[in-house]
Amino acid sequence: MATMMSMSSFAGAAVVPRSSASSFGARSLPALGRRALVVRAQTEGPSAPPPNKPKASTSIWDEMAFSGPAPERINGRLAMVGFVTALAVEAGRGDGLLSQLGSGTGQAWFAYTVAVLSMASLVPLLQGESAEGRAGAIMNANAELWNGRFAMLGLVALAATEIITGAPFINV
């Protein structure tokens, strides 16, 4: 309340004529014919648009570089398909991972899968898309990387199990 009184007395002294302002002990401004508040504002002129970010290089050598986005994603995708396929064949026929790789049919399917998934992974990257930009709510780019890493470890574990025990992981 005291703050409001002191502010109103200060404001009153600024607009009250000189003779009545002397009781407040403050200097007053000359009385104006009309009491209006003038606010001057200036808008900023049209500014230049922000500079565009340089477009990411879409060279195949940049994408396939050691620290590029493609190698780990492609290998992870191949490992995910390979791990599930190896387990399905082990469960269906009883063939272990190493015996699957030794057969001519297994090598043909491996080569075909590598070619198709590599091209399917490279085409969007070469068009300038990123895995982070295509991420959804459940399956994001980070989850894909971790699933691929675990699938790679799973393939190594399947091979190690077959080498150590002499039998496939899933015995039918």
Swiss-Prot record:
It is a multi-pass membrane protein. Induction: By light. Keywords: Chloroplast, Membrane, Plastid, Transit peptide, Transmembrane, Transmembrane helix. Residues 1-38 form a transit peptide. It comes from the Eukaryota. The keyword Membrane applies. The chain crosses the membrane at residues 106-126, 150-170. It is found in: Plastid, Chloroplast membrane. One of its GO terms (cellular component) is chloroplast membrane. Its main location: plastid. The keyword rRNA processing does not apply. Pfam families: Chloroa_b-bind. Signal peptide: none annotated. InterPro entries: Chloroa_b-bind. Belongs to the ELIP/psbS family. Probably involved in the integration of pigments into the mature pigment-protein complexes. This is Low molecular mass early light-inducible protein HV90, chloroplastic. It comes from Hordeum vulgare.
